[in-house]
């Protein structure tokens, strides 16, 4: 993990003083201009890392001398980024050994801070950079007791069977979630109000569907809908999937595994690329995962299960013998355990591993603060065949082992809690004996197709009713410009003057600045490191609209330029139009218009994937959607 010096970033920002309003504005303008120049310099390095010209800052350059280096603290920041200055030279140079990952992190946080100041916000402290994360990552997390102490308990099993011994170790490990200081930190990192608001909106939409007769399902519980929002936020914004750690020289993630070693309690994968070794720490300690926020399915499930506990869900960590880890959360409304796979952003689709992923399943166990359960039968529907595969221990001995672990976990529970757990366990065991047919979506290895879950995830008609109207800066420039990066899932409004771009506003997530959409979602391909907007699976068509309104001004459209990248396969078809509200495609001299994209066609089970908007690499810094409107 690459850390950056946030103090240097914060130091160059305008300070609250008793100076006049004009003086404060001058200081702010100087800061904005200096950071703009620095961002351009860093952007050049990132775009052409091997060009030595871009790694040199000449001190005889007037703009560098008068606008960048004149800002108090800027030289210290340059050193923090990695630039070096020697007395004999008249320049700063950025050595090749400074990693692109470090440069990118400084670029991201400086850009974010500048945008905040530009929009009028005056944040108290700089946010820690995180490409796909809206919540600042703390640099250090305090716990009540050290990690090893949190997961160490007296052994109760007397078996020599290593497989059974591992069950007790897994059960002990989840007890780290109950650290009060850790729980408080976790709660502070979750945007609970925002997620609850989204869940409430989805619930009201579903209530309308039920009232109109369009949906025959039972009204969902707000806590269940909040769980879906939490899963989506965690997968798309909070945690980052890592195949290989980035090379510190070239930034590539194609490095080869050289060896695995142990440092303290942490297993470390050592990769090599460009002759340099890089380390990927496979943390189990939640206090470390809340800082790094990256990993694979094990880290995903471990951290997500903990965050569920932060919101007081009864949650348990699920380990399978086929090398996959996920979460189960108890729904108090449905009185059953819900399967949640945070690394795949999937809720309530337990049979997908057996029927969609085609995995061989023999043992699956779930662990919580006061329970341990053999849940293999929830994830299979051919129980007799599965029993034939279970050869690691005697079934009777397995039951005795789980009972012993369960008793260990419940020894400090109240009589009332023990009675509740006993009743719940009995009902769960009865439910686990039932076999059911997989849904169509489980057969294809993806999330449940239930309308309630699709609606709660926003996978239906989504009306945000966001309309763009020119602000003061845009009116002054007679411009209305909007661009979108699918890699970062961010919109930017900006003005352009002689090639110089000034950011005005940013909007996080593709839904945030749309007018409406139907059957659209953002697909992230971790293996290929690509992102794009596509149709929902099993839908024949989709639509998304962005709307613009000039009626409250005396301006109209003079001309426009549109970059709108699409990709189709086979018989897939995408229609893109810029039109007035009454459907006319000539928008010059209009005061209202909209951009409309319609996706349709394709064949087979992956027809939805044959129409894609804004497909780009997750590392791309381009804007596949860029609309520039000139007004008069």
From Swiss-Prot:
Binds 1 zinc ion per subunit. Its cofactor is Zn(2+). It comes from the Eukaryota. It is found in: Cytoplasm. Coiled coil: none annotated. Keywords: Cytoplasm, Hydrolase, Metal-binding, Zinc. It catalyses: Hydrolysis of an N(4)-(acetyl-beta-D-glucosaminyl)asparagine residue in which the glucosamine residue may be further glycosylated, to yield a (substituted) N-acetyl-beta-D-glucosaminylamine and a peptide containing an aspartate residue. PROSITE patterns: PAW. GO terms for cellular component: cytoplasm; cytosol; nucleus. Its EC number is 3.5.1.52. Zn(2+) binds at residues 247, 250, 273-274. GO terms for molecular function: metal ion binding; peptide-N4-(N-acetyl-beta-glucosaminyl)asparagine amidase activity. The active site is at 297 (nucleophile), 324, 341. It is an enzyme of class 3 (hydrolase). Specifically deglycosylates the denatured form of N-linked glycoproteins in the cytoplasm and assists their proteasome-mediated degradation. Cleaves the beta-aspartyl-glucosamine (GlcNAc) of the glycan and the amide side chain of Asn, converting Asn to Asp. Prefers proteins containing high-mannose over those bearing complex type oligosaccharides. Can recognize misfolded proteins in the endoplasmic reticulum that are exported to the cytosol to be destroyed and deglycosylate them, while it has no activity toward native proteins. Belongs to the transglutaminase-like superfamily. PNGase family. This is Peptide-N(4)-(N-acetyl-beta-glucosaminyl)asparagine amidase.
